[in-house]
Amino acid sequence: MLKLWLGLALTADSSALFRGSNSFGMSLKRPSELYKHLRVSKRYILGKSHDDIVTSLPKDEDAPELESRLQFHKQFMIGAQSNRAGLGSNRKVQDADILKSFIRQDENDKYKIHAMNLEMQNEWLDIGDFCIPLALKWRTLIYDWSPALLKFYLNAFQMTLPDQSNLVRWGKSTEKTCYICGKAVGTAKHLLVGCKVLLDSGQYSRRHDRVLEVIREAVSLSVARAQKGITTNERSVGFVREGTRATKSNVKPYSILKAASDWTIMMDTYEKQYKIPEDICASASRPDIFLFSRILKRVVMIELTVPWETNIPKDHTIKVNKYYELTNELTRNRFVVDLYAVEVGARGITAKSLYNLLKDLGLSRTHINAFLERTSKAALVGSFQIWLGRERSLDSGGERITRIK
């Protein structure tokens, strides 16, 4: 029923609905897991009773194992710092919450083991080291995303879009080749990032520029914050004396930018290109965003890629190497250079490299989360448009793209 409601293909792995957000899932509660949580809550409440009859009631079959794990946790783990609360944090965690976390972890372990046995729907196991899971909040699903966009995302991430390859696999077609180029196998991956006809027609570039515009807004905001003195380019470390409580810090957030009156942002798009000023560097290279200040002798270069998520590490290395010579030339011209190769996946999964950029720009946590959501949606909407136009793809002049035989 949930698959039908969300528009998921029948062959889609249903664990995507119930996995935690850190495992690229929707964090819905499976009834069996919710039932276990309720039993833990009931046992915890009854165990605190002062009535001997209540406390002597028979326990669940799995109670001894859970209680054994709880005792081990309290004896060896409770003093260790396993979260971001800071050393010495004494926030008391209820036993029932710890037991529920055990149940949740057991369920996630089952999902991982199940995914390892899948042939296609297990990419989420590979990208967790370098990608940030999409935060599918109810606010986003209700007010921001359309049902069609959610359906596209879930099926694209689960590799269950009705592309030519899957239609043949499901016995609904005999033609496996791409609608547009007529050469490669028509998978969703090929259509969204690998079709040469779509590349030459500018479809991928327009999606890329949609994401790049959001990043440019983040850079502009960072420059404005530096001008107003909201951020500083000097790092500071706060210390708390033993036996004292930490107080709210008034230290300004760190940013790679300093206040200067001549910060200039140049952006390379499909419709409009730029040239690096010759007094800065004589080069034909054009990073997607070129931010510079002659007064500070500072350059920040940002190169964006919108790849298939599993290709992010490889593409990141390619883009860093691409601007190696330009970085050296700028350094020889006595400029301080920061190069950021950032990635936003074609299915809306952002790479950690983008988070690192936004953090180094000195943006607040609220701003960072907002820009991550916006870049994610921009990439996803761009891919959705490509998907919708897979049989009627048009070039920039409005004419049908000729299928290559």
What are these regions (language model features)?
Residues K172, Q227-M301:
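Active-site metal-binding core of divalent-cation-utilizing nuclease and nuclease-like domains
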Residues R286, R298, E303-I318, V344-A346:
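Short beta-strand-loop-alpha-helix junction that forms the active-site gateway
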Residues V219, V320-F335:
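Metal-dependent nuclease catalytic cores in nucleic-acid-processing enzymes
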Residues R169-S222, V299:
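Short Cys/His-based metal-binding microdomains
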Residues Y143-D144, L167-G171, S201-S205, T310-D315:
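Conserved, non-catalytic sequence blocks in retroelement Pol enzymes and Pol-derived host proteins
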Residues V337-K405:
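Domain-level recognition of nuclease-like catalytic cores that cleave nucleotide substrates
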Residues L6-S173, T177, Q385:
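Extended C-terminal regions of large enzymes
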